[in-house]
Amino acid sequence: MRTSTQIETASVLVGEEKAVEYVAKAGFDAWDFSMFAMCDYDWQLGAVRPTTHPLAGENYLAFARKLKQIGLDNGITCNQSHAPLPTSCPEIRSYFKRAIECTAEAGGKICIIHPDNDRSAAENAEMYLELLPFAKDCGVKIATENMWNWDDAKDESCFAACATSESFVEHIDAVNDPYLVACLDIGHAE
């Protein structure tokens, strides 16, 4: 069994390069290429802001290769990635193919693309089916992931796409392709 963790939390403080190195030094076998910085989403305004992050620029694949090499130099590999979010934003959806490309370039085998929390399995399947031919060409599987919504009035989590085992299976069955897999995020499951 291999253990991995995402680099997003550390990269906010020290950048992706050091984050990969620190994940290795912490004893993990692999790293999750967290690509949330590819798009700077303002949650209060509900809009994408301009960013100068390397993943948003024209040399994004060179940046992915650089991170891969840092991992290899430190004895770990990229096993998976997280595409930018939220999926409900059409402008962010336009970056999903870039995220799949970066996953392949970094050596990852799975790119996690969150379902749209408020869409049905059939509606989310349309998005995944549109991306699957490109993902297959890159040799990367797409993973859907268990999600949650928050009810401010009740101060508790409430239903979202893939929040239950039934919804998770419904999403996988709606696509019915071995290149769409499931990622159970235990941080989302609490």
Question: Where on the chain are the PLM-derived regions?
Answer:
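N-terminal pre-domain/capping segments
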Residues: 1-109, 136, 173, 177-181
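Acidic/histidine-rich catalytic cores of soluble enzymes
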Residues: 2, 18, 31, 130-190
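Active-site-proximal loop/turn and secondary-structure-junction residues that shape catalytic pockets
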Residues: 9-11, 35-37, 84-87, 116-119, ...
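Active-site-adjacent beta->alpha loops and helix N-cap segments on the catalytic face
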Residues: 41-42, 119-128
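Short, well-ordered secondary-structure micro-motifs
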Residues: 44, 91, 123-124, 154-155
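Charged helix-capping and loop-helix junction motifs
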Residues: 59-63, 93-98, 124-129, 161-166
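Short, surface-exposed alpha-helical recognition segments that flank or form part
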Residues: 91, 119, 159
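Active-site groove signature of glycoside hydrolases
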Residues: 103-122, 138, 143-154
